[in-house]
């Protein structure tokens, strides 16, 4: 479970406040204009930013003031942050131990995750030898080996071409189902949101302006669809 109660934060003179309740295993997309607070919301959940006030429960534990390393979350950004001098196997292994001192059990887990994301034949390669999609797969694998119940994605596939982006979304969808992960994914693409999440949050000026079915935004039946440039089917 993920629960935010009046979590506030001041960003460049824009006061933000978030109230949110997400059930275990739920997949939620986060949309909204640039600068509205989408990435800030994820950073608050991950612990990279400290809220001014409020209360946060992650996995039924109070993590309002916990440092990032102690939170039950993994986060993947648009920039994959792979180390160029390390192999794919070593980059993934950093998710298990910063010094890469892995036990036999951890090595087996790494091999299993690499197979899940389709990188079992690339483990001895350097990031420069991978395609853009493979690099994002490696970054995703590094998140998954941590075995945390909450996965945060901050536009990690936006730089990929449509075919690769769709491939990665299908992979994330399958991984979340298999591992029963709770997912929050920031995107600027409503179609991507619809592929992976039945529920969408629309962030506007530091507030959750819409919390409801993704499909209602797609077909314009939600009045707030106009924020995304979609003509609303609602007659006022």
Swiss-Prot record:
E.C. numbers: 7.6.2.15
Chief subcellular location: membrane
Gene Ontology CC terms: plasma membrane
Annotated SMART domains: AAA (SM00382)
Alphabetized GO MF terms: ABC-type thiamine transporter activity; ATP binding; ATP hydrolysis activity
Claim: Transcription is one of the keywords in the record: no
Bilayer topology annotation: Peripheral membrane protein
Domain ABC transporter: 2-230
Subcellular location: Cell inner membrane
Binding annotation for ATP: 32-39
Catalysis: reaction(s): thiamine(out) + ATP + H2O = thiamine(in) + ADP + phosphate + H(+)
Keywords: ATP-binding, Cell inner membrane, Cell membrane, Membrane, Nucleotide-binding, Translocase, Transport
Assembly information from the UniProt record: The complex is composed of two ATP-binding proteins (ThiQ), two transmembrane proteins (ThiP) and a solute-binding protein (ThiB).
Summary of the function given for this chain in its UniProt record: Part of the ABC transporter complex ThiBPQ involved in thiamine import. Responsible for energy coupling to the transport system.
Family annotation (PANTHER family): SPERMIDINE/PUTRESCINE IMPORT ATP-BINDING PROTEIN POTA, THIAMINE IMPORT ATP-BINDING PROTEIN THIQ
Sequence similarity: Belongs to the ABC transporter superfamily. Thiamine importer (TC 3.A.1.19.1) family.
Name of the featured protein: Thiamine import ATP-binding protein ThiQ
């Amino acid at each position: 479970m993920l629960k935010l109660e009046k979590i506030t934060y001041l960003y460049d003179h824009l006061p933000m406040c978030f109230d949110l309740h997400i059930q275990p295993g739920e997949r939620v997309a986060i949309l909204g204009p640039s600068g509205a607070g989408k990435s800030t919301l994820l950073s608050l959940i991950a612990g990279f930013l400290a809220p001014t006030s409020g209360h946060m429960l992650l996995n039924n534990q109070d993590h309002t003031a916990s440092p990032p390393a102690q939170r039950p979350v993994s986060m993947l950004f648009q920039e994959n942050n792979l180390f160029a001098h390390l192999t794919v196997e070593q980059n993934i292994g950093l998710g298990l131990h910063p010094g890469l001192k892995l036990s036999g059990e951890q090595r087996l887990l790494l091999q299993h995750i690499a197979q899940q994301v389709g990188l079992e034949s690339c483990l001895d390669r350097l990031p420069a030898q991978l395609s853009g999609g493979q690099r994002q797969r490696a970054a995703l694998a590094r998140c998954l080996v941590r075995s945390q119940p909450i996965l945060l994605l901050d536009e990690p596939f936006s730089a990929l071409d449509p075919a690769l982006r769709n491939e990665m979304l299908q992979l994330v969808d399958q991984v979340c189902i298999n591992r029963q992960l709770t997912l929050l994914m920031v995107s600027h693409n409503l179609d991507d949101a619809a592929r992976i999440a039945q529920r969408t949050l629309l962030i506007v000026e530091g507030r959750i302006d819409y919390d409801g079915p993704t499909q209602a935004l797609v077909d314009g039946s939600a009045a707030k669809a106009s924020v995304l440039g979609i003509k609303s089917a609602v007659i006022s």
